[in-house]
C-alpha cells in the first residue's frame, strides 16, 4: 500500500476509535440530558463511517468490486446516521419543547430524503453535503446560546467552525510533506469532534 493511502487509512481509523470512545463516555454519563442520546448516535455514525472509509481506502484493488461498493454504500449511510444524530441532539438541547416534535419530524424527513438517494451516490460530495448541511443547522441553533455564554453551545459552535476549516483544507488540496489534504482533513476533524464531545459533556437542562 502506498504511504499516502496508509496514512489516510490510519487517520480514518483514528477518527473511528476517537468517536467510539466519545460515544462510550457519553453513554456512561449519569443523568444524561435527553440531547446526549442524539450525539451518541452521531458519534457512532461517524465511527462506523470512518471505519468503513479506512477499510475502503486500504482495500482498493485488493477486494472484489462488489465488496468495495458495499463498503462505500455503508459509509454513505453511516454519515446519514451521524447527521441525524447531530440534528436530533441539537433540537433537544435548543428548541423549546412545544416545537420539538415538529422539528424532529423535519429531521426524519431530511434523513429519509437523503437515504432514498444514497444508493445512487457515487461520490463523497453528496454525503459531505448532507453532513455539513446538518452542521450548518446545528450552528444556527447554537449561535444564540453561545452568544449568551452557554459553555456547551460555545464548544459546539467551535466544533462546527473547526469542521469548516477542515473542509476548506480538503477543498484546497493542500498537501504538506508526506501528508495529503485528506490526512489534514481527518486530523482537523478530530479536533472538531473533541469540541463537540466537550460541548455535549456540559449539557444541562438549561442548555
Language-model region placement:
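Conserved phosphate-interacting/catalytic interface
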Residues: 51
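Polytopic alpha-helical membrane-helix bundles and their juxtamembrane interface segments
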Residues: 1-46, 54-75, 80-207
